[in-house]
Amino acid sequence: MVGWLFLGLLLGLFFGILTYRIVTGRRRPDRLTLAEYWVYVEEPRVPKIEAVMTRMVSENPHTKPGSPCISNREGMLFTDLRLHYAAVLKSKNPHAFRPDLFSVSTEPTAEVLERLADCPGFLKCRYQCETLLKDQRHLTFLPHMADAFSDLAKGHVVYDPISEEIMTREEFKERISSAKNLESPLFHLRIVWERAEEGWRAVTKGLMKVGRSEWASSFQEQDQEVLVAGLFT
């Protein structure tokens, strides 16, 4: 009797673990997917989600006839628990308004620095997942959410902490308008020529958006930038 009870407990434990894996997905610490945008604004309050949805779907200025930017496929992310957005105040996080404290590859222009001085906060939107994704719809959804935040809260500057790139609101908007496919690496991936003690190397910035580790070349002489970076494209 005890043996059958023990067997029943083992089977229950096995099926419990199996069900958990099916529901949550297979976790891979090395496959963290993280995409994020900071939109520096005059009005650091998260707009009502209904207004954001309207701006992204029915009133999206980037939509072309017969080809909506945010379809039902992307729209499902509005209720995805892996989507996070919040307001961040300059008074409580002054370091987040200092691009000189960001990575070396983040190169703000004089105009960006001037605009940052006029922003009392920023709106952050992030998509983070620790399981293998079936598609990359978040790569389309998140830039449009950042652009909507910018329009609704009087944005001035947009920072991408994953690709380590900062730009004016107009530059970001133009990139979205001119992009044929926001899920393309051309929109999200950068190749940076980076200096270290051992020499220079080409490094990718943005692969974490699709759950992959950044790539890096072997160390080279400084004048090999064009040749080495070309191998990544």
Regions flagged by a language model, labelled:
Residues 10-14:
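Core hydrophobic alpha-helical membrane-spanning segments
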Residues 31-47:
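N-terminal mature-domain "stem" immediately C-terminal to a signal peptide or N-terminal signal-anchor/transmembrane
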Residues 16-34:
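Transmembrane-cytosolic junction motif
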Residues 45-114:
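N-terminal low-complexity, intrinsically disordered segments
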Residues 86, 90-192:
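Internal, hydrophobic cores of structured domains that mediate oligomerization or house catalytic pockets
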Residues 164-233:
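Aromatic/basic-lined ligand-recognition segments
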Residues 1-8:
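Feature marks short, highly hydrophobic, charge-poor N-terminal signal-anchor/signal peptide-like helices
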Residues 37-41, 130-138, 219-224:
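Conserved aromatic-histidine-acidic binding/catalytic patches
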